[in-house]
């Protein structure tokens, strides 16, 4: 019975395109979606198309004297998670004076030294409005040499600094805590070289990820990472936080994709590790110290990164499951059946879908007939459309027969695929519209991943709503607790329980967002005291005056 029903579903909903007809012939280009066609055709692949991600994006207006960000949507409520442990300003740091400003103007010019209160205020606050510093100075270097001179001077004066990219982080890592000098890398946005044979991109740290994606796609390649914030985040910030994102399951972490770095150390020394070699087994591979160190060991100024080939066939499926065990089994089945073409495996619970439908404009539920407990978004990319399509259809047929999938849709065209991704990527945006959001980014063994969501619902009760979603393919849970307003009572129900529970599972309290200010004092939940002490030793060696991004990453007690 199950096989007949599934086969019937395949026959009824196979894509309606005529033989030889392409999406291009219908005018369905990635940036020309037109009106959404809601008659979803199931089990159909998208030929030669790459999805376009939705997420938090900023418009950046730049001239000789200005570089500022304006959010495309208005964040009316604050987002809270883990009230950062209060830290005292380090009295060893100097206070900025007029002589300092004069020196910076001598190397950057007047346009590169920003003291305007409104413009500095934008750089002082994270995009969620949660963390706000009191810096009086924003510097806009345009070269590695200028960054080197800035750090050399600040180190000699013991002026603390905070490097800043697109400022899209969630843990307070890219904004000042007190009066640190802000060094924006946005003016360093040049593409240096691209190796068309090997797909190796060399660029400056201030390049916006989306711009790099467009550049390499025109060359027949893609960036190995893709984020909802790609319209505003910088590649240097991605490297410094070891950003994960939606392609992690296919291409792995940046530790595997980054071939070389140029980094400016605290004393102004330029550390040239900008190799483009795939193999180099000469001594310690120092670049890995700076990937994920959040600007606390040095400021990344240039990057050489390996970009995978852009594949012509893309499929996006939106599936429903009755329980979390089915999601786990579906992941295992996808890895076995889809193998090399599996490029994303995202999951969302029904609370996420309900929230997205309520607060996101222009999205439509692909499976509106019956509510389900869990939803899975699967993306495949490959080089042979007919092969990929047949492989995906066979996988879905078996999954329905085995009872792993309750219902499912595969996008017929790019607008439908974009709708699927808009739902997944828009959950964070929708969450903010409720009120206070307590956000946690956890790495947990897949079999235990949803247990913390259920435990949190029991603890929170009717005080708030708990959402669970994330990158199931790599065990990364985004746990969001929503409430109409922030309260100490709610926070007490969440913390330290969420960290203690994660630690007991030998998980990580930060899967991809970093530690920043928010979790610096909580690193012991994921790292041993010996490991933390070794990290502190490295920090003291490379930054003895501790001027680089202070109060972040490591507890103040070990420095």
From Swiss-Prot:
Broad EC category: oxidoreductase
Localization: Mitochondrion
GO cellular component, one term: mitochondrion
EC number: 1.1.99.39
Recorded catalytic activity of this chain's protein: (R)-2-hydroxyglutarate + A = 2-oxoglutarate + AH2
Cofactor(s) listed in the protein's UniProt record: FAD
Keyword annotations of the record: FAD, Flavoprotein, Mitochondrion, Oxidoreductase, Transit peptide
MF term (GO), any: FAD binding
GO aspect biological process, one term: photorespiration
Cofactor note: Binds 1 FAD per monomer.
Domain FAD-binding PCMH-type: 131-310
Coiled coil, from the record: none
Range annotated as the organelle transit peptide: 1-80
Assembly and binders: Homodimer.
Task of the protein: Catalyzes the oxidation of D-2-hydroxyglutarate to alpha-ketoglutarate.
Protein name from the UniProt record: Probable D-2-hydroxyglutarate dehydrogenase, mitochondrial
Organism listed in the record: Oryza sativa subsp. japonica
């Amino acid at each position: 019975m199950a096989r007949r029903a599934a086969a019937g579903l395949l026959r009824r909903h196979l894509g309606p395109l005529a033989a030889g007809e392409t999406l291009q012939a219908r005018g369905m280009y990635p940036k020309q979606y037109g009106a959404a066609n809601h008659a979803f055709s199931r089990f159909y692949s998208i030929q030669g198309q790459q999805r376009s991600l939705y997420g938090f994006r900023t418009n950046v207006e730049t001239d000789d004297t200005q570089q500022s960000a304006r959010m495309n949507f208005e964040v009316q409520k604050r987002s809270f998670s883990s009230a950062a442990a209060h830290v005292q300003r380090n009295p060893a740091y100097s206070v900025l004076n007029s002589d300092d400003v004069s020196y910076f103007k001598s190397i950057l010019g007047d346009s590169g030294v920003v003291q305007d209160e409104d413009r500095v205020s934008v750089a002082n606050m994270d995009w969620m409005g949660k963390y706000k510093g009191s810096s009086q100075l924003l510097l806009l270097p345009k070269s590695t040499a200028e960054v080197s001179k800035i750090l050399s001077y600040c180190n000699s004066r013991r002026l603390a600094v905070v490097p800043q990219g697109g400022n899209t982080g969630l843990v307070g890592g890219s904004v000042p805590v007190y009066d640190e000098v802000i060094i924006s890398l946005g003016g360093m946005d040049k593409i240096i070289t691209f190796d068309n044979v090997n797909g190796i991109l060399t660029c400056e740290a201030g390049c916006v990820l989306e711009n790099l994606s467009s550049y390499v796609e025109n060359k027949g390649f893609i960036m190995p990472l893709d984020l909802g914030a790609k319209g505003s985040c910088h590649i240097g910030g991605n490297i410094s936080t070891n950003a994960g994102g939606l392609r992690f399951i296919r291409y792995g972490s940046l530790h595997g994709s980054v071939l070389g770095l140029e980094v400016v150390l605290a004393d102004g020394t330029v550390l040239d590790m900008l190799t483009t070699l795939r193999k180099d087994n000469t001594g310690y591979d120092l670049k890995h110290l700076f990937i994920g160190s959040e600007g606390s060991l040095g400021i990344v100024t240039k990057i050489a990164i390996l970009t995978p080939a852009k594949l012509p066939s893309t499929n996006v499926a939106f599936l429903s499951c009755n329980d979390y065990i089915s999601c786990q089994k579906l992941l295992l089945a996808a890895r076995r059946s889809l193998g090399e073409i599996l490029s994303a495996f995202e999951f969302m619970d029904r609370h996420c879908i309900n929230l997205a439908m309520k607060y996101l404009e222009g999205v439509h539920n692909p499976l509106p007939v019956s509510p389900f407990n869990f939803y899975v978004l699967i993306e495949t990319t490959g080089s042979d459309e007919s092969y990929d399509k047949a492989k995906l259809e066979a996988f879905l047929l078996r999954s329905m027969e085995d009872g792993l999938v309750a219902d499912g849709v595969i996008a017929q065209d790019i607008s439908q695929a974009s709708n699927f991704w808009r739902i997944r990527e828009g959950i964070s945006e929708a969450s903010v519209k409720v009120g206070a959001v307590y956000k946690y980014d956890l790495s947990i063994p897949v079999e235990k991943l949803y247990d913390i969501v259920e435990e949190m619902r029991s603890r929170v009760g009717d005080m708030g709503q708990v959402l669970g979603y994330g990158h199931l393919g790599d065990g990364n849970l985004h746990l969001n607790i929503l409430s109409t307003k922030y309260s100490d009572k709610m926070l007490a129900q969440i913390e330290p329980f969420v960290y203690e529970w994660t630690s007991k599972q030998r998980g990580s309290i930060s899967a991809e967002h970093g530690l920043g200010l928010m979790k610096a004092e909580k690193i012991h939940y994921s790292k041993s005291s010996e490991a933390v002490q070794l990290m502190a030793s490295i920090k003291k060696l490379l930054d003895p005056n501790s001027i680089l991004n202070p109060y972040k990453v490591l507890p103040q007690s070990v420095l």
